[in-house]
């Protein structure tokens, strides 16, 4: 499933083609994805101007000029593709011709303005993605967002905040980090990588990073810094291209070439002087990769 860096990369890739454009028609080629489309979705979006693109956790947000926001989740295999309706190239770094099987094109944004007519196509072979529309003022109260924790790159995330969340918790550290109520948008790949960078075991209790008085230990400061770094590095690299993720320009992300532990079972740990080997275990049905020699 695309994680925060992948969705951020898609948002940045779509922005030059979508922001400021008018949706002449929203074409729905089926009645549902993972869930049924909201009633009259095509009518509510058609004719509107896109005033901005945003992201919250793993959700792409398309702000419209009538005060509504279209919410899109990529699910397991969803992606967007930009198609020009004229010969002139679209601005921005992310632009590519058609790149996926058209039989899985389920939603088409027909756009005009700026560089001329164009289409932004949502393609989803597995159909685990979904879309919804809600008033922008009501976004924080929407069931998708009301319980989300702070963004991993935002100012709200700090060691003191995590100490409050983790205090007295016997829950494994990795599970606590994947809990979207604690931190929004973190997923399996980047949690594994952040834990390796901070030399923390995914199986240790989250509460062990907090003093008896409720203050964060130094290791928690290092963990927060590692989370910020790994997310920033992944966004800069365009995300990871594992399995179905693809950028808005049709190319692949390159952060997977920088993995230190994820999907590296049996390989040597990259920590200088460690000498350990990357192991794979299963936690809550998900693969965890870590080095037992240097992650404590």
From Swiss-Prot:
Pfam family of the protein (one): Fapy_DNA_glyco
Alphabetized UniProt keyword annotations: DNA damage, DNA repair, DNA-binding, Glycosidase, Hydrolase, Lyase, Metal-binding, Multifunctional enzyme, Zinc, Zinc-finger
Disulfide bond entries: none
Coiled-coil ranges per UniProt: none
Entry's EC annotation: 3.2.2.23, 4.2.99.18
Span of zinc fingers (FPG-type): 260-296
InterPro entries, A to Z: DNA_glyclase/AP_lyase_DNA-bd, DNA_glyclase_Znf_dom_DNA_BS, Formamido-pyr_DNA_Glyclase, FPG_cat, MutM-like_N-ter, Ribosomal_uS13-like_H2TH, Znf_DNA_glyclase/AP_lyase, Znf_FPG/IleRS
Family statement drawn from the similarity comment of this UniProt entry: Belongs to the FPG family.
Name listed for the protein in its UniProt record: Formamidopyrimidine-DNA glycosylase
Protein source organism: Rhizobium etli (strain ATCC 51251 / DSM 11541 / JCM 21823 / NBRC 15573 / CFN 42)
Gene for this chain: mutM
């Amino acid at each position: 499933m695309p994680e925060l860096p992948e969705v951020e990369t898609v948002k940045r890739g779509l922005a030059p083609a979508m922001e400021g454009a008018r949706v002449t028609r929203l074409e729905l080629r089926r009645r549902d994805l993972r869930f049924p489309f909201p009633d009259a979705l095509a009518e509510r979006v058609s004719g509107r101007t896109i005033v901005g693109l945003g992201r919250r956790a793993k959700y792409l947000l398309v702000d419209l000029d009538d005060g509504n926001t279209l919410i899109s989740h990529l699910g397991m295999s969803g992606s967007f593709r930009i198609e020009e309706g004229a010969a002139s190239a679209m601005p921005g770094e992310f632009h590519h011709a058609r790149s996926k099987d058209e039989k899985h094109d389920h939603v088409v944004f027909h756009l005009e303005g700026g560089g001329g007519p164009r289409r932004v196509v949502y393609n989803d072979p597995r159909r685990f993605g979904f879309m919804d529309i809600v008033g922008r003022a009501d976004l924080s109260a929407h069931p998708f967002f009301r319980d989300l924790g702070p963004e991993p790159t935002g100012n709200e995330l700090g060691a003191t905040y995590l100490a409050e969340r983790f205090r007295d918790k016997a829950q494994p550290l990795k599970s606590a980090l994947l809990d979207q109520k604690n931190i929004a948008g973190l997923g399996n790949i980047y949690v594994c990588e952040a834990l390796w960078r901070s030399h923390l075991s995914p199986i240790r209790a989250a509460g062990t990073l907090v003093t008896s008085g409720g203050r964060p230990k130094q290791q928690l400061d290092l963990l927060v810094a590692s989370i910020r770094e790994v997310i920033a590095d992944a966004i800069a690299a365009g995300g990871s291209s594992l399995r179905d993720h693809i950028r808005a320009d049709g190319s692949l992300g390159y952060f997977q070439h920088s993995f230190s532990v994820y999907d590296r079972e049996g390989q040597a740990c990259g920590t200088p002087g460690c000498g350990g080997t990357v192991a794979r275990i299963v936690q809550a049905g998900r693969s965890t990769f870590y080095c037992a020699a240097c992650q404590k």
